[in-house]
Amino acid sequence: MDKWLWHARFCKTRAIAQDKVTKGHIRLNGQRVAKASAAVRIGDVMTLASSGKVVYLRVLGLGLRRGPAPEARTLYEIIEE
């Protein structure tokens, strides 16, 4: 999960992504995720809490690299903000 968050550019570093997961700021399919190494699959619904906002998104792809922002945007669709 930390790698996907990094590929999709929701976190600047994987360490920040790992920290967000372990602190409970990320949910996967409505369940709190305990480990940053949790598997993310296409079609999963992810809930991100950050800066007083909650964002719901659907995973559309699994990135192979941390590419430019337009490429990262193809990995998800925002369901609700």
Predicted features by range, described:
Residues 1-42:
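A basic, amphipathic helix-loop patch mediating RNA/tRNA/ribosome contacts
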